[in-house]
UniProtKB/Swiss-Prot annotation:
One Gene Ontology term from the biological process aspect of the record: cytoplasmic translation
Pfam families, alphabetized: Ribosomal_L6
SUPFAM superfamilies, alphabetized: Ribosomal protein L6
Keywords: Ribonucleoprotein, Ribosomal protein, RNA-binding, rRNA-binding
Protein known as: Large ribosomal subunit protein uL6
Annotated gene: rplF
Subunit structure: Part of the 50S ribosomal subunit.
Similarity comment: family membership: Belongs to the universal ribosomal protein uL6 family.
Lineage: Bacteria, Bacillati, Bacillota, Clostridia, Eubacteriales
Amino acid sequence: MSRVGKLPVAIPNGVTVTVTPDNVVTVKGSKGELVKAMSNKINIAVEDNSVVVTRDNDHKDVRALHGLTRALINNMVTGVNEGYVKTLELIGVGYRAQLQGKKLVLSLGFSHPVEMEAVSGVEFEVEGGTKVKVKGIDKELVGAVAADIRKWRKPEPYKGKGIKYENEVIRRKEGKTGKK
């Protein structure tokens, strides 16, 4: 039995979960609605105030899907209830972020500003010009958009300049010592 998969997903007040016979899970909450198609090898049932995920057999691929399905449903329930936030920090001289409508404009030392359009389901928030918050209800989408922003200038190990996640620790390297 999967250690993750055997735990039921608690459904908080204000959140409704429905499962169709072909394993399409719909989660509605105060922040929005998420719909995701799950594998037919897994059984999903809504009982009382929880979602129970079970499997029919112990094949390796089904065991792997068991924990995955439970985790995905848990992420959906948390997303529509609380939402997800990824915070990015811009470190470097002249590195700035600003919002123009729903568009995020980054000055990252290139000859041109980097413009990113907000994907549906994700919104940006800029604090002090050097902190960007990516908010949304879909954990996967929030993480993907944050990774897209970060890839423009990954933190470099010598001075630590670049775009990093809020609690990310950058391994620093020693520079060259030179001749004496």
